Every structure is written in structure tokens, then in C-alpha cells.
Amino acid sequence: MTEAMIRNKPGMASVKDMPLLQDGPPPGGFAPVRYARRISNTGPSAMAMFLAVSGAFAWGMYQVGQGNKIRRALKEEKYAARRTILPILQAEEDERFVSEWKKYLEYEADVMKDVPGWKVGENVYNSGRWMPPATGELRPDVW
């Protein structure tokens, strides 16, 4: 769309022939602009907000406490189950250890049969107390 069609002046020779249109304020002027701080009088009071937040916090902490009780009970149940089966597991391990120890003593007797004065199964450290072997030779085959 051309300027000539917009202003209804076809065939203008110069821009100076165009009628002068200038933006200005509406008749009577613009409405006053309020630039002061606006503090609303509606909505909950500070005390109401404080009480609501405090109540929500208290309810949340109550829920955390209930969750802690449940988690503690589940943990105790797990430990009780482990304490219950521990003697059975220990008995199985002791049985396995004894059979492996017998095999170890037989192997030691076979290897050291030519050494004079060697006593099979005797502790070489002479500490006076029994300790399980720490060298790993009596570990299960899966290890």
C-alpha cells in the first residue's frame, strides 16, 4: 500500500504536498500515571502466613518422624533375621573349615615327610593361641 492511497491524495508531486499528521495526546490529555508504591490491603496477614508455614513444617516433620520409625523397624527386622540365621551359617562355615583343615594337614604331611623333626599341624609362631590361617589357603574354591 502506498502513501498516496493511505492519505487519499493521489498523484502528489512532492512529499511537501502531503497533509501534516502528527501524533499527540487525546483530547483532554492522558490519564494520570500512578507511580507510588502499591501496597495491597487484600490477602492473608503476616500472622496467617506464619501460622500456615509453621503448620506445614510441623506436619512435615511429623511425617519424617513416622518414616524414621518405619525405617528403624524394618532395619531391626533385617538385623533380627540375620542374627537368627547366623549360627546356622557359622556351623556350615565351621564344617567346611574342618574338612579343608584336614585336607591341608594331609598335604602338609605329604610335603614335609622327608623333613626330620617336623610336626604336622604345629604352629610355627609359638604364640600360645590359635588363630585361623591368614594366608588364604583355606578359602573356598569360589574365592
From Swiss-Prot:
Quaternary state and interactors: Complex I is composed of at least 49 different subunits.
TM region positions: 43-65
Keywords annotated in UniProt: Electron transport, Membrane, Mitochondrion, Mitochondrion inner membrane, Respiratory chain, Transmembrane, Transmembrane helix, Transport
Similarity comment: Belongs to the complex I NDUFA13 subunit family.
Membrane topology: Single-pass membrane protein
Main location (coarse class): mitochondrion
InterPro entries: GRIM-19 (IPR009346)
GO biological process, one term: embryo development ending in seed dormancy
Protein name (record): NADH dehydrogenase [ubiquinone] 1 alpha subcomplex subunit 13-A
Location in or out of the cell: Mitochondrion inner membrane
Function: Accessory subunit of the mitochondrial membrane respiratory chain NADH dehydrogenase (Complex I), that is believed not to be involved in catalysis. Complex I functions in the transfer of electrons from NADH to the respiratory chain. The immediate electron acceptor for the enzyme is believed to be ubiquinone.
Record keyword Transport present: yes
Top-level taxon of the source organism: Eukaryota
GO cellular component, one term: mitochondrial inner membrane
